[in-house]
UniProtKB/Swiss-Prot annotation:
The UniProt record lists the keyword Signal: no
Alphabetized SUPFAM superfamilies for the sequence: FMN-linked oxidoreductases (SSF51395)
EC number, as in UniProt: 1.1.-.-
PROSITE patterns, alphabetized: FMN_HYDROXY_ACID_DH_1, FMN_HYDROXY_ACID_DH_2
Location of the FMN hydroxy acid dehydrogenase domain: 1-380
Residue sites binding substrate per the record: Y24, Y129, R164, R278
Protein name as catalogued: L-lactate dehydrogenase
Keyword S-adenosyl-L-methionine: no
Gene3D superfamilies attached to this UniProt entry: Aldolase class I (3.20.20.70)
Stored InterPro entries: Aldolase_TIM (IPR013785), Alpha-hydoxy_acid_DH_FMN (IPR012133), FMN-dep_DH (IPR000262), FMN_HAD (IPR037396), FMN_hydac_DH_AS (IPR008259), LldD (IPR020920)
Organism this protein belongs to: Pectobacterium atrosepticum (strain SCRI 1043 / ATCC BAA-672)
Length: 386
C-alpha cells in the first residue's frame, strides 16, 4: 500500500489488525457524533494564505515545560499500544525520540515503565488516571520518578467509562469475546506472528507489577472498571500536586471554568480534550472548545490540545486556535500498527512536511507566528459564535 499522506495509515492499519483491535482504537462512545466532529470541525477551519514572504528561515522548534521540541507535537498516552505492534510502546517511544519530541506512556500500557524509559535517550512523559486504588497511584508515581520521568499527564475525564458500542460488535467485549478474538487472530497472520506470538507478555505491565501477577485483557477490563472513581474532586488531587515535583498537566479540559480551576490548582498545563470522542458523546469538538479556553487562560498555563488531529495542517489549525502544542493519539497508533517504529517516524516526517507547507503559505516563520491571524476570520467568527 502506498503511503503518501499521514491519513493513509488508517487504511493500512485496518488491513493488518484483527477487527477487535482496529475498532478499539478507531471507535468512539455511543453514536460517535463527537468522534466525527473532531475531525470534521478541524477540516472546516480555513487557513489564511499569504504570499511573497521570505520564509527561508522557517523553524518548527518550540519549548514545552522547559523541554526543547523539534516541533510542537507530543505522542499521547494510548492504552494497550503494545497490542498494535510488538512491544509497541517501546517502538513508539523510539520513534518520538528520533524525531525530537516526547512520548507519553499510558497507565494501562503493555510495556511497563521500566522497559520503556531505558529504551530512549530523553525523558518520557507518564500518564496517570484518577483511580480508587491510591496505593497503585502512589506506586506508579514513585516508579515513574525512579525511571527519570519529569512530566506527569493526569487524566481526569474518566470518573466513569463511556459506552463504546463498537467494542461489543468487534469482539473487544460482549458475548464470546475471547473466542471471537482468537478467530480474528488466526485470520490475520501477520499480526498474529508479530504481536500475538512474538510480542508477549500480553498483559498490562504497570498494573501487573503492582498486583504481582499477570493482568490479561479480561483482568484489565474488570480492574479498570472497579477502579473508576466518580467521587474525585480537585481537593482529592492535592496530594499528587504535593508529591509530584515536576510539571503536571491536567488532561480532559473542555470548559473555560475548568481551565481556570486548573490554573488555581497549580497545574503547569492542560490538555483540551474530549478523550478522542471516547467518553461523552455530544460534547463539543476540541476545535470548537479550544478558542474560549484559550481566551480564558492563555498566558497563565500551557495549553495542549488533542482529538481529531490527523495531519500537519491540523496541528497548525490547533495552534492558531490557541494551543501551544498538540498531542497525537490515533494517528500514531495507526502508523505503528501498519509499520512499527519506522511507520511512526514516517508519519512524523509527513506531519512535519505538512506543517512546513502550511506555515510557509500562511506566512508563519515560527510557532509563535501561528495565531488567529493565520485563519480566515469568517471561520473564527463561526467558532466564536457557538
Amino acid at each position: 500500500m502506498i503511503i503518501s499522506a499521514s491519513t493513509d495509515y488508517r487504511a493500512a492499519a485496518q488491513r493488518r489488525l484483527p477487527p477487535f483491535l482496529f475498532h478499539y482504537i478507531d471507535g468512539g462512545a455511543y453514536g460517535e457524533h463527537t468522534l466525527r466532529r473532531n475531525t470534521a470541525d478541524l477540516a472546516d477551519i480555513a487557513l489564511r494564505q499569504r504570499i511573497l514572504k521570505n520564509m527561508s528561515d522557517l523553524s518548527l522548534e518550540t519549548q514545552l515545560f522547559g523541554e526543547k521540541l523539534a516541533m510542537p507535537v507530543v505522542l499521547a498516552p494510548v492504552g494497550l499500544t503494545g497490542m498494535y505492534a510488538r512491544r509497541g510502546e517501546v517502538q513508539a517511544a523510539r520513534a518520538a525520540a528520533q524525531k525530537g519530541i516526547p512520548f507519553t506512556l499510558s497507565t494501562v500500557s503493555v510495556c511497563p515503565i521500566e522497559e520503556v524509559a531505558p529504551a530512549i535517550d530523553r525523558p518520557m512523559w507518564f500518564q496517570l488516571y484518577v483511580l480508587k486504588d491510591r496505593g497503585f497511584m502512589r506506586s506508579a508515581l514513585e516508579r515513574a520518578q525512579a525511571a527519570g520521568v519529569k512530566t506527569l499527564v493526569f487524566t481526569v475525564d474518566m470518573p466513569t467509562p463511556g459506552a463504546r458500542y463498537r467494542d461489543a460488535h468487534s469482539g473487544m467485549s460482549g458475548p464470546n469475546a475471547a473466542a471471537r478474538r482468537m478467530l480474528q487472530a488466526v485470520t490475520h497472520p501477520q499480526w498474529a506472528w508479530d504481536v500475538g506470538l512474538n510480542g508477549k507478555p500480553h498483559d498490562l505491565g504497570n498494573v501487573s507489577a503492582y498486583r504481582g501477577k499477570p493482568t490479561t485483557l479480561e483482568d484489565y477490563i474488570g480492574w479498570l472498571a472497579a477502579n473508576f472513581d466518580p467521587s474525585i474532586s480537585w481537593q482529592d488531587l492535592a496530594w499528587i500536586r504535593e508529591f509530584w515535583k515536576g510539571p503536571m498537566i491536567i488532561k480532559g479540559i473542555l470548559d473555560p471554568e475548568d481551565a481556570k480551576e486548573a490554573v488555581r490548582f497549580g497545574a503547569d498545563g492542560i490538555v483540551v480534550s474530549n478523550h478522542g470522542g471516547r467518553q461523552l458523546d455530544g460534547v463539543l469538538s476540541t476545535a470548537h472548545a479550544l478558542p474560549a479556553i484559550a481566551d480564558a487562560v492563555k498566558g497563565d498555563i500551557t495549553i495542549l490540545a488533542d482529538s481529531g488531529i490527523r495531519s500537519g495542517l491540523d496541528v497548525v489549525r490547533m495552534i492558531a486556535l490557541g494551543a501551544d502544542g498538540v498531542m497525537l493519539g490515533r494517528a500514531f497508533v495507526y502508523a505503528l500498527a501498519a509499520a512499527g517504529e519506522a511507520g511512526v517516524v514516517n508519519l512524523l516526517n509527513l506531519i512535519e512536511k505538512e506543517m512546513r507547507v502550511a506555515m510557509t503559505l500562511t506566512g508563519a516563520k515560527s510557532i509563535a507566528d501561528i495565531t488567529s491571524d493565520s485563519l480566515v476570520q469568517v471561520t473564527q467568527r463561526r467558532l466564536d459564535g457557538l
